[in-house]
Amino acid sequence: MEHTHAHLAANSSACGLGFVPVVYYSFLLCLGLPANILTVIILSQLVARRQKSSYNYLLALAAADILVLFFIVFVDFLLEDFILTMQMPLIPDKIIEVLEFSSIHTSIWITVPLTVDRYIAVCHPLKYHTVSYPARTRKVILSVYITCFLTSIPYYWWPNIWTEDYISTSMHHVLVWIHCFTVYLVPCSIFFILNSIIVYKLRRKSNFRLRGYSTGKTTAILFTITSIFATLWAPRIIMILYHLYGAPIQNPWLVHIMLDVANMLALLNTAINFFLYCFISKRFRTMAAATLKALFKCQKQPVQFYTNHNFSITSSPWISPANSHCIKMLVYQYDKHGKPIKVSP
């Protein structure tokens, strides 16, 4: 993320928001970090209990959000800009910047396979458990993490476009456009297309009730996450492109305020997912309350009952109960590697 405070620290009047950024980012870190850690704990229990692909993706998303809060909110904004009030040496600073881009790209792109997973679950339910299963999900998550890190290496040369003496180059334009495409335009296009298909499918079959708790709740969580992401990240993308192609900076103070607000909104996305899950999912809300109660009372949580094998029944969610006897149910159990094994009914 761009540095706008360190080079303005010598002139306190240059920071139009005063102490608002440091208070905001401190609050965001103190709120978001425990919330995401609690999310990881709860989703880890759900993954062990139910072996659902969607829980694995949400778990990976929470882990990526923790990395974003650490590298960007703590190291970049709080430690460097407000505590040290000076920029780090060039090489360590650039390495941290690569890790920042890697974490934010991972946080965004881990939602893409989750969207694809929900699309298959809703639109192709009979194929869902042969396409999406725990072993494959873990491979997809690992691939996203590795790919996002490797593709973030070129951001070692990311320019600070907000300095007054910045000189634009063609390489900088390429990096900025790649950033805008990879963190916003491409993911939002995928979210919009697949979510539109899912909504169309749900509306077309609105006279039937969804079978299964997780399909409806997870899909609602997906819609909420992607909608909030598109809304909160839009100001940052607009600011970057406007500054790159708009008029030269005439009022650095105003630009500084606008960029601060844009970054605040974008990073808010990493701290609120826990509260969205609690609002939408009763199961998640109940487990969160139980975990917090056990934590504050320093007691172990009750031992949950786990079966030796995880079973799931795959059928179309649009089949009415009256005609369900005409449909052959496909029952899958997972082996020790998380791959589905079809069992004859």
Swiss-Prot record:
Q: What is the annotated localization of this protein?
A: Cell membrane
UniProt-recorded Gene Ontology molecular function terms: G protein-coupled receptor activity; identical protein binding; neuropeptide receptor activity
The principal location of this protein is membrane
Q: Is NADP set as a keyword in this record?
A: no
A single GO CC term for this protein reads:
plasma membrane
Q: Enumerate the glycosylated residues.
A: 11
Q: Name one GO biological process term.
A: G protein-coupled receptor signaling pathway
Stated membrane topology is: Multi-pass membrane protein
Task: List where the protein spans the membrane.
Answer: 22-42, 58-78, 95-115, 141-161, 174-194, 221-241, 261-281
InterPro entries documented for this protein: GPCR_Rhodpsn, GPCR_Rhodpsn_7TM, GPR139, Orphan_GPCR1
- What Pfam families does the entry give? 7tm_1 (PF00001)
Q: Which regions face the Cytoplasmic side of the membrane?
A: 43-57, 116-140, 195-220, 282-345
Supply the alphabetized keyword list. Cell membrane, G-protein coupled receptor, Glycoprotein, Membrane, Receptor, Transducer, Transmembrane, Transmembrane helix
Q: Does the keyword Transmembrane helix apply?
A: yes
Task: Give a brief account of the tissues where this protein occurs.
Answer: Expressed almost exclusively in the brain. Abundantly expressed in the ventrolateral region of caudate putamen, the habenular nucleus, the zona incerta, and the medial mammillary nucleus.
| Extracellular domain ranges by topology | 1-21, 79-94, 162-173, 242-260
Q: What does this protein do?
A: Orphan receptor. Seems to act through a G(q/11)-mediated pathway.
Q: Which family does it belong to?
A: Belongs to the G-protein coupled receptor 1 family.
| Protein name stated in the entry | Probable G-protein coupled receptor 139
Tell me which species this is from: Mus musculus
